[in-house]
Swiss-Prot record:
GO terms for biological process: cell division; cell wall organization; peptidoglycan biosynthetic process; regulation of cell shape. Its EC number is 2.7.8.13. Keywords: Cell cycle, Cell division, Cell inner membrane, Cell membrane, Cell shape, Cell wall biogenesis/degradation, Magnesium, Membrane, Metal-binding, Peptidoglycan synthesis, Transferase, Transmembrane, Transmembrane helix. InterPro entries: Glycosyl_transferase_4, PNAcMuramoyl-5peptid_Trfase, PNAcMuramoyl-5peptid_Trfase_CS. It is found in: Cell inner membrane. CDD domains: GT_MraY. The gene is mraY. Pathway: Cell wall biogenesis; peptidoglycan biosynthesis. It comes from Bacteroides fragilis (strain ATCC 25285 / DSM 2151 / CCUG 4856 / JCM 11019 / LMG 10263 / NCTC 9343 / Onslow / VPI 2553 / EN-2). The lineage of its organism: Bacteria, Pseudomonadati, Bacteroidota, Bacteroidia, Bacteroidales. One of its GO terms (cellular component) is plasma membrane. This is Phospho-N-acetylmuramoyl-pentapeptide-transferase. GO terms for molecular function: metal ion binding; phospho-N-acetylmuramoyl-pentapeptide-transferase activity; UDP-N-acetylmuramoyl-L-alanyl-D-glutamyl-meso-2,6-diaminopimelyl-D-alanyl-D-alanine:undecaprenyl-phosphate transferase activity. Catalyzes the initial step of the lipid cycle reactions in the biosynthesis of the cell wall peptidoglycan: transfers peptidoglycan precursor phospho-MurNAc-pentapeptide from UDP-MurNAc-pentapeptide onto the lipid carrier undecaprenyl phosphate, yielding undecaprenyl-pyrophosphoryl-MurNAc-pentapeptide, known as lipid I. Belongs to the glycosyltransferase 4 family. MraY subfamily.
Amino acid sequence: MLYYLFEWLHKLNFPGAGMFGYTSFRALMAIILALLISSIWGDKFINLLKRKQITETQRDAKIDPFGVNKVGVPSMGGVIIIVAILIPCLLLGKLHNIYMILMLITTVWLGSLGFADDYIKIFKKDKEGLHGKFKIIGQVGLGLIVGLTLYLSPDVVIRENIEVQKSENEIEVIHGTHDLKSTQTTIPFFKSNNLDYADLVGFMGEHAQTAGWILFVIITIFVVTAVSNGANLNDGMDGMAAGNSAIIGLTLGILAYVSSHIEFAGYLNIMYIPGSEELVIFICAFIGALIGFLWYNAYPAQVFMGDTGSLTIGGIIAVFAIIIHKELLIPILCGIFLVENLSVLLQRFYYKAGKRKGIKQRLFKRAPIHDHFRTSMSLVEPGCSVKFTKPDQLFHESKITVRFWIVTIVLAAITIITLKIR
């Protein structure tokens, strides 16, 4: 909104109004404003949650031996993150930009889904929350909206990066002069760092391009569902999900910035995406909101984000990566989320396989994997064998959290470095 006001003032030659035309200025303002909202207003909101007794519900110590220490801590703090993202974006962003619109829809959509889940848990006293099938329907619905919008909108285009052999030892990357609708995505180790989904369904002949878009929509649905659930599982320790997501957000912000700048895109040999500079505004608000929230969520947590926050930040990361055509980098960048997801799936599969044989067995002491590192064998169900019992030493949750942050930083660096590998 302020962008349009200052654009009008700039036409009237109002001093300083031209600053809002610079993406870097608006991005800096977005991160500062989001940080202030989440830290200052967040404190007031936490006190409101306490007064209304919107707190973590009692947990069964046999099921969750760590949760009993968290009872009474305010939950649904994800509202702080959502508000701290939306206000800067609405004030500083170009609200006609298709990418900004999609990110705002994602934030509100998954925020509402997570809010419904938390509401049922806290106010209806139902520990299961929103039924799993409704969560999946919500995530699939969002993936469908995002995928079809990127397919149908004429504003969603790229300029393809092309490698040109200038000499025997020198390759120059140039970009086409025409905007294209494309099913290409960025992936290391492929020619020009690009993979075209249409090539994967080349056997469809003249229908390959349409089939490529259908495949893209399916992958979009899968990525949105997987990453939002991964972030949800990662939110099991104080500061864990917020810290990891801020690091991932910073990396995506860098990728969005270079994708919106034709020279930087050429340096990294990735496609140029016109209009994606508005995503930098959004991701800066995202980072600022998470850092401000982390002020209260770091150990010992004064507030939990709940599913209101974790589903939202996971979905934001997924949709953002899809928009900038970097969704196939998610297994590297969001490696922590991937491992958390896999640990839960493998634990269930291994347990059920043993149950069919009449054996009590688990792959890890506890899942998701971050709980494995703080669980002693005494907390495992009596008579249950555990495949992986190491490490013998138990770690405090703050140490586990920081180490997971470090792993995410390393994965973020690898994500960017791989793009320079020819």
